[in-house]
Amino acid sequence: MHKGRQNMKNIVLLKGDGIGPEIAAQAVKVLSLLKGFALQEEDFGGCAIDKTGEPLPNGTLQAALGADAVLLAAVGGPKWDACPKRPEAGLLGLRSALKAYANLRPAVIYEDLKRISPLKDEIVSRGVDIMVVRELTGGIYFGKRGRGTEDGAEYAYDTEKYSEKEIERIARMAFDIALKRSKRICSVDKANVLESSRLWRSVVNKVSQDYPEVKLEHMYVDNAAMQLVRDPSQFDVLLTSNMFGDILSDEASMLTGSIGMLPSASLGGKTGLYEPIHGSAPDITGRDMANPIGMVLSLGMMLKYSFNMDRESLLIEKAVRGAIACARTIDISGGCKSVGCDEMGDIIAGNFERLLREDV
C-alpha cells in the first residue's frame, strides 16, 4: 500500500471515534500487504465536531466523493450527546451523498465460536451463513410523517412508500449476490397486510424471472423473525425493505455471539462505504480490548464489492478463521485466555501475509 500516489485505488479512511482508531490500525496492517492502494485519512464524527463543529466536514465529504471506497471504523459517543449536531448525523449525510441504497450485513457463526452463540447446539451445528440485503433509502423511515389532534386527542403517523424502481434495484443487487452464493433468496415482506409489501412482492417476482437459476421464497416478516431463531440455516440471502431489514439484521447479528465480529457494506453509487456494525465502545477505548475482526472483514467486503478482488477477500476471511482458532479478544473468549486488539491484528495480518504467499 502506498499513500498519495497516482493511478492507485483510492481509499478514504475515517477512523472516527472511540475504539475507531484502534481497530482501523488493524485493518491498515492487512491492507498494507496489498499493492496498488492509496490511503487518505479524514476527520469524521465526533472528532470532526471537535475540530470543525461539523460531523461531516466539507473536506471529508469531497474526499469521500472522489474516492473509490470509504472505510469507516466507528462514530459517536456520549461526549457529543448534547451537541446540536450529533456525530451520527454525519453518517446519514455520508450515506446520502454516496447514494447508498443497499446495506449488506453478513452474519456467520464460525466453527470455533459455536459455543458463544446464544442458540442451542443442535441449531448452531446446522451452520449459519446469512447475507441480509436491506433497502436503505426508501420506506417508512423516509415517508411522509406528522402529528395532529383529533377529538381532543393527539395522533401521529408515518407513511411507508416504495416505488417500483426502488424495489427493482435492491432486488437485482440481492439476486446478483445470490448468484455468487448458494443461489437462494428469501424476500421478506408483510404482503398479507401492507399494500407496499404487495408491490414489493410483485416486483421481486418480476425480477426473479431474469434469474431462473436462483430459488426465490417469500416469507412474512413475523415468521422470518421466528425462523431466524428456530432454524437460521434455512436462509442464505435475505432481501428486505428498510424497516424490516433494520430489525432482522440486528436479530441475525446476535446469533453470532458478538457484534464485534460483523462487517457491513452500504452500496449503490460509485463509491461504497464499509464499516463494522458495532459502535464506538467508549467504555473500552484505549484499553486494547476492542475486537478488530468486524473492521478487518469490512475491509474484505471492500475488496470484494468495490474492487472485484474476490481472492484477496476470501483470504482475509481465511486469515480471520485461522486467527480465532488460536486467539480471541475478550468479547469472544468464552472463558479462554484473551489477546488484545493489537495482537489480534498482528495475528490476522500474519495469517493473511502467509496465505498470500501460498495462494499463488
Predicted segments with their positions:
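Glycine-rich phosphate/nucleotide-binding loop
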Residues: 46-49, 108-110, 115, 229-327
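Buried hydrophobic positions in well-ordered alpha/beta secondary-structure cores of metabolic enzymes
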Residues: 17-20, 68, 133, 174, ...
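Accessory "access/gating" subregions that flank catalytic or transport cores
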Residues: 192, 200-201, 207-260, 352, ...
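N-terminal glycine-rich phosphate/adenylate-binding segment common to multiple enzyme folds
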Residues: 50-157, 243
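Internal helix-turn-beta structural module
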Residues: 306-360
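Short, Lys/Arg-enriched N-terminal segments with co-localized hydrophobic residues
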Residues: 1-7, 358
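N-terminal beta-loop-helix "entrance" segment that forms/cooperates
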Residues: 37-59, 226-228
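Glycine-rich phosphate/diphosphate-binding loop of Rossmann-like nucleotide-binding domains
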Residues: 11-34, 150-222, 234
